[in-house]
From Swiss-Prot:
Organism in which the protein naturally occurs: Rattus norvegicus
Subunit-level organization: Monomer.
Family according to the record: Belongs to the class I-like SAM-binding methyltransferase superfamily. TPMT family.
Binding sites annotated in the UniProt record for substrate: 35
Encoding gene per record: Tpmt
Name the UniProt record assigns to this protein: Thiopurine S-methyltransferase
Length: 240
């Protein structure tokens, strides 16, 4: 369903906005985590079967995973989940809130990084920057669920981010991606506005891109930012 969302002419206005890893860790410390969705994402629920295509034993990647409960949805269905998150608080809260026992160990490839693994063995969460992750050799993935990652990455880092994502995709992949549309002159981000033209630049040469759905996602907290519209657009990216 198309809502006829127009591209904003001032898409470049956020391009120099930068948040550091410390800024993101501080959000967890100060509990500024409105981006976390307690019930999981409704668009993923709706398109879950389409995304999985009835396949079993998939490897699923969650970039900038936080404590997303959707990770357990996949694990409970027998899939292997790997996430990356800079905040150790977020990772520990995921395991605590989902009542999962886990182990933790340092990552020798990345100074100061750790990997947390569920005792069942099918959830592994890496506590490090996603830009350091390639050194951990985590393998390739059949599915990627990206609800709050591309829209959180500094606009100047999107090319690097896309390169990492593309390097993690296995033949026959499905990459499900949510981007946001709002007036970027009213809110500095994050989350950032990602126009369609930017998506095509990042992924269009390697991926087929299909917009599955556009939804009006305006909440009161968005209005406090000064924006008067806020749309989510769900894309499915597949192999060309």
């Amino acid at each position: 369903m198309s809502l006829g969302i127009k591209e904003h002419p001032d898409a470049e206005v956020q391009k120099n906005r930068v948040l550091t890893l410390d800024d993101w860790q501080d959000k967890w410390v100060t509990r500024h985590i409105a981006f976390h969705q307690e019930q999981g994402h409704q668009l993923l629920k709706k398109h879950f079967d389409t995304f999985l295509k009835g396949q079993s034993g998939l490897r699923v990647f969650f970039p900038l995973c936080g404590k997303a409960i959707e990770m357990k949805w996949f694990a409970d269905r027998g899939h292997t989940v790997v996430g990356v998150e800079i905040s150790e608080i977020g990772i520990r809260e995921f395991f605590a809130e989902q009542n999962l026992s886990y182990t933790e160990e340092p990552l020798t490839e990345i100074a100061g990084a750790k990997v947390f693994k569920s005792s069942s063995g099918n959830i592994s969460l890496y506590c490090c920057s996603i830009f350091d992750l390639p050194r951990a050799n985590i393998g390739k993935f059949d599915r990627i669920w990206d609800r709050g990652a591309l829209v959180a990455v500094n606009p100047g880092d999107r090319d690097r981010y896309a390169d990492i994502i593309l390097s993690l995709l296995r033949k026959g992949y499905h990459y499900l991606l949510v981007v946001l549309s709002y007036d970027p002159t009213k809110h500095t981000g994050p989350p950032f506005y990602v126009p369609d033209a930017e998506l095509k630049k990042l992924f269009g040469t390697k991926c087929n891109m299909q917009c599955l759905e556009e939804v009006d996602a305006l909440e009161e907290r968005h209005k406090t930012w000064g924006v008067d519209y806020f749309f989510e657009k769900l894309y499915l990216l597949t192999e060309k």
